[in-house]
Amino acid sequence: MTTSADQTDVLVIGSGPGGAGVTLKLVQAGYKVTCLEQGPWVTPPEHPHYHREWEIEKQRGWAYDPNVRGLPEDYPVTGFTTPYLMNNVGGSTMHYAGHWPRYKPVDFRKGTEHGLEGTIDWPISYEELAPYYDENDAIYGISGMVGDPSYPDRTGVDRDPPVKPGKLGRNFAQALGDLGWHWWPSDNAIITRPREGREADIAAGNELSGSPTGSLSTPTHTHWPTAIALGADLRTHARVEQIHTKNGKATGATYIDTRTGARHEINAKIVVVSASGIGTPRLLLMSAQKGHPDGLANSNGLVGKYLMHHILRVLASVVRTSRMEGYKGAFGAPLYSHEFYHTDTNRGFVNGFGMQVARSFGAAYTAMGSHTGYVAPWGKSHRKFFNEHFGNHLMVFMFGEDLPVETNCVTLDPDAKDSSGLPAARVNWEPHENDIALANYGIDRIFEAARALGAVETNDTGVLNPPPGWHLMGTCRMGNNPEDSVTNKWHQTWDVPNLFVVDGSSLTTGGAVNPTSTIGALAVRAGDYISRRFSDIVDQRTTPSNEDAPAI
């Protein structure tokens, strides 16, 4: 049974950084916004960090992979992938570390730089996005240090002081300095000063399951309280079944209450999809209907194509020359190195990578040999092993920019279903030979830095294939024309002018840094555009080209 339809100005699907950013901007401008989130609110006592067995719970109900959690709000993701997805208010920020780098100017013009495989230029520049980066940072609350010479000047942007580097950060910075390599204290979405009822970070440890105190900046703290106070209608346990269209325009959606199974309809003048780099193409493909037989916004067949994860290798080692105490402090990276960020074809590949120093995990992870492969023995030698390893652990991530390849994609699984009977997402991802060459070169450089620090028992994961899907990018990418993209530069789908996509799907290329800062900036920009051009968008019968679209 389907209830009678509600009416709203803008329907937003998904409550993570994309959906939250658009919603907040629109309700601040006075628009009526309804946001549908298929998961629940997570209250502070529900965070695993409230419990002694948090390391165990992170392997069960708080596992990164929805296939492991299997909660009613999750949907299966099949194929060659290990997806990192959360379905709850705030989206997958409930699993992020809060590392908050921006893309660099060169990241927006990779098509011009090399154009390999499916690489194209972004339809916007760093300079166009920079003021929205600033606005987004102010909403979240960011810690860090301005002045990194590898970025354009940002001296006017307010920051909290950086998270404390600890012995881990100071020791690795010394090693990088001895090699003459770039390093800089990381920007993190972690506040180090109290802010609007949120507590400052106290270096209490791992926050990879959100922060019940609010020190880790997630939309549950930074967006939704304000948006709801301004009139946003956030509906949880609301799983969207299909987006509807009529006469070439989106008209709203049908959603299922996952608690009762009841179906509800909602009509809207504009629809914004912000359901993640897997969830958004899945929903658009599920929305196949008359006039859109291959899925919504998919007349060119590119919905779900060009999936990027970042190519990833992880070094884990033990340092005996000095205590690292990596378990102390927020998990957000204390520092990074972009010494090898830019393309140098003399290395035999295009694109580059960044190094991120990461805190180590807790005692149980150490004993199990997480990332290191060195498992604590039972018996008399257990304590000796533990004393040598816990507190001496070094972990460094190599994030490389993978190429957008058309066959790396999200489709609908013909067999698997979610708890509502809707098709699961199926993912295919294979590393390009350029990605593998980049990863091999990158891990060699990280080994070099670890040796400079005195690391022993050094191990690495190899090219993680598939990589953990922390970053789900590119599957409905922005572009300059309908032949090679799904949306124009304002996130309007080429096929349906009042249907927008604003999330990791929008990213044209992936850069070699974490994408959440960029997703948030794009959301502020898209919300600004929709609020200023609302009437124009509602009246449009076709999506304008980037040249013809009305400016802000």
Swiss-Prot record:
SUPFAM superfamilies: FAD-linked reductases, C-terminal domain, FAD/NAD(P)-binding domain. It comes from Mycolicibacterium austroafricanum (Mycobacterium austroafricanum). Its EC number is 1.1.1.400. Pfam families: GMC_oxred_C, GMC_oxred_N. Induction: Induced in the presence of MTBE or tert-butyl alcohol (TBA). Keywords: Cytoplasm, FAD, Flavoprotein, Oxidoreductase. Belongs to the GMC oxidoreductase family. InterPro entries: FAD/NAD-bd_sf (IPR036188), GMC_OxRdtase_N (IPR000172), GMC_OxRtase_C (IPR007867), P2Ox-like (IPR051473). Involved in the degradation of methyl tert-butyl ether (MTBE). Catalyzes the conversion of 2-methyl 1,2-propanediol (2-M1,2-PD) to hydroxyisobutyraldehyde. Its cofactor is FAD. GO terms for molecular function: flavin adenine dinucleotide binding; oxidoreductase activity, acting on CH-OH group of donors. GO terms for cellular component: cytoplasm. It is found in: Cytoplasm. It comes from the Bacteria. It catalyses: 2-methylpropane-1,2-diol + NAD(+) = 2-hydroxy-2-methylpropanal + NADH + H(+). This is 2-methyl-1,2-propanediol dehydrogenase.
